């Protein structure tokens, strides 16, 4: 793999991991249509996930620091973060159960381009209707256990290529009456255990040995980190300004175009 190839894949991973357009769907489409493209190796996949996870940690460093110290501080803010930590754990449970139980099915779906195209259309529908029906919703302090559980199920469903993780989790929280900024923030914090879990699974599949391409892979990871930071910042602004419609249209166009090509 060349440096350019690694940087382009890192850019793709960082942008599509957090923007509501499905990173897995774009990776599958790239594999089908880009000449000479092949699925990256396990180590490269691990480093890309590490780059995007670092982007969340840096962007939400205040939240992450307080979550880490929530059970060591007695004041009221720590109590709020202890509650948020419990909600994140609740959201992670269905993701882990469904993801591990149906892993082979989701892996098989990666090669079904018509299905991926339809799932992109579904993602567009979720974004459109959640934006259209949203109201001034509940803040983080009013998130409920049921909200977290439903968001976790949505995140699990997003393992299906073409379904956006951020798009589906933000959409279901908007449908549940959560404010846009709170929904996006909770969605990104939910990504940490999900991405960490995906990284751990990849590590378990990593054959022994050190790759000579580590400097190339590291370049891809750095690009995933930088583009991940940019995409998080962009999506937070889009949600605040109620402009998810733009991503809905993008998903519809991509899904429709590639469904027509692959059918």
UniProtKB/Swiss-Prot annotation:
Gene Ontology molecular-function annotations: undecaprenyl-diphosphatase activity
GO BP annotations listed: cell wall organization; peptidoglycan biosynthetic process; regulation of cell shape; response to antibiotic
Keyword hit for Ligase: no
Give the reactions, separated by semicolons, that this protein catalyses: di-trans,octa-cis-undecaprenyl diphosphate + H2O = di-trans,octa-cis-undecaprenyl phosphate + phosphate + H(+)
Sorted alphabetically, which keywords does the UniProt record give? Antibiotic resistance, Cell inner membrane, Cell membrane, Cell shape, Cell wall biogenesis/degradation, Hydrolase, Membrane, Peptidoglycan synthesis, Transmembrane, Transmembrane helix
- E.C. code: 3.6.1.27
Gene Ontology annotations for the cellular component aspect, listed alphabetically? plasma membrane
Q: Which domain of life is it from?
A: Bacteria
Q: Any remaining note in the record? A: Bacitracin is thought to be involved in the inhibition of peptidoglycan synthesis by sequestering undecaprenyl diphosphate, thereby reducing the pool of lipid carrier available.
Task: Give the family from UniProt.
Answer: Belongs to the UppP family.
The name under which this protein is listed is: Undecaprenyl-diphosphatase
Q: Which organism is it from?
A: Syntrophotalea carbinolica (strain DSM 2380 / NBRC 103641 / GraBd1) (Pelobacter carbinolicus)
The gene that this protein is the product of is uppP
């Amino acid at each position: 793999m060349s440096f350019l190839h690694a940087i382009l894949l890192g850019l793709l991973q960082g942008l599509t991991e957090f923007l509501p357009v499905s990173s897995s769907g774009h990776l599958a489409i790239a594999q089908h249509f880009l000449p000479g493209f092949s699925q990256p190796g396990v180590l490269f996949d691990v480093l890309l996930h590490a780059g995007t996870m670092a982007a969340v940690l840096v962007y939400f460093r205040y939240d992450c620091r307080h979550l880490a110290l929530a059970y060591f501080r007695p004041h009221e803010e720590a109590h709020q973060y202890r509650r948020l930590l419990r909600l994140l754990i609740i959201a992670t449970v269905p993701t882990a159960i469904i993801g591990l139980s149906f892993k082979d099915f989701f892996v098989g779906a990666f090669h079904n381009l018509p299905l991926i195209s339809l799932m992109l259309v579904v993602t567009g529908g979720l974004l459109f209707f959640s934006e259209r029906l949203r109201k001034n919703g509940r803040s983080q302090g009013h998130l409920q256990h049921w909200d977290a559980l439903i968001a976790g199920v949505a995140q699990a469903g997003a393992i299906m290529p073409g379904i956006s993780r951020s798009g589906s989790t933000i959409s279901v929280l908007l449908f549940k009456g959560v404010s846009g900024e709170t929904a996006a923030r909770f969605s990104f914090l939910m990504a940490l255990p999900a991405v960490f879990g995906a990284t751990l699974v990849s590590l378990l599949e990593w054959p022994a040995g050190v790759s000579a391409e580590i400097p190339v892979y590291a370049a891809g990871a750095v690009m995933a980190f930088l583009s991940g930071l940019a995409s998080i910042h962009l999506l937070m602004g889009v949600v605040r300004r109620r402009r998810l419609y733009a991503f809905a249209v993008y998903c519809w166009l991509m899904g429709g175009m590639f469904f027509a090509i692959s059918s």
